[in-house]
């Protein structure tokens, strides 16, 4: 067995020392473990989700209680993660289903060029198209390892045996190069096998709290528990991968990063910019590199901070790797326990996600979080935030919960639930997260918050201008002009023309004649 490669905490203290270490054999391994649409883990006190592997990593490393993605859809969130840049800085990659810009590099590509053995299983970056100049597929997260399969426990769980594929990756390792592996589960992305949670001993009464923007009934609770089953599938493979890494003597010097691309795939969560949309679980473990492990931090951190953290750990810079300058910040002050936080604010935003509006229009939002306040600016409030009703609210994945909310519109007593998830929104929103984590009470028109509203609006726009956001320069329409690579592109226009284009992620019952009572 090869001797373990160590990088001491003293080396991590300075960029010069790190660069020196990176030229030798002491660079840390990197293990990224990303769930698909997971907003919950047991370590955060969720009694109906059991994640012993995640919880163990958090207890042996750092649990981040205020980690966020800036853009809560798979492709743009993952683009931010692998580049260290906010989505409005990524041109086409700000959108869902884009063509990834050929001149924007990912950190796994940079690590591969510097001698790392890279690979991934499951879902890397996507959905979208990423190609080299010759038309071949780019390995944005490494070489694909998806050949090993399993018999899924439910019809909603993917057949890829993630842990076994990590084993296949290790078989090709030369035992000299440092490792960089991406475990990208496709769970808990929809669809689910409705009611499968009962086979795993789960009961609707297990749910301690249903968000205030959904009906609290057995159907919704069952949907939540089916989602929990898939998170637990992710966690089981996480545990197996950690055991395998330990068995080859490499866990001690591996930076293990466990997170999700965004929040849960339910109405008013995934695809929006509320707390449940953008807040993500995050635990980082590095046995020989984190000072005072077992900590919990409330520092505001972004998924854009992961790439600069990794680059600092391995001793590389953007300039020498050809990566674009990163807007994210290294987490080393937190890992070293030398600072309580790295920033007092976070920026959020989205552009075009799934189709379903005329001409494939997006729903542009920008936002900022500071001092437990969330400010959002909706730049096209006349557009439907969840997608047009008559084309199935395509920006919300089909589900039993979504069906319940569409039904709620027809009942005067529950119509407000439909308004919260599907209805039109004002130009500005402001929420006090310390008292209203569900983001129900919009304070934008409250005189008591007028000064906060003005200050947050000004700070957000100033910081976005500094980052070169086209929307701050009057060029925001460029995001709608970028090609849409989804097979359901121009869905609204095609439906209106009498076609029946594919709509895999929504149900036929989602199509809603808004005038119907």
Predicted regions located by residue number:
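Formylglycine-dependent sulfatase
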Residues: 2-429, 437-458, 472, 487-517
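Bilobed periplasmic-binding protein-like "clamshell/Venus-flytrap" ligand-binding domains
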Residues: 457-475
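A glycine-rich phosphate-binding loop feature that marks nucleotide/adenosyl-phosphate handling sites
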Residues: 476-481
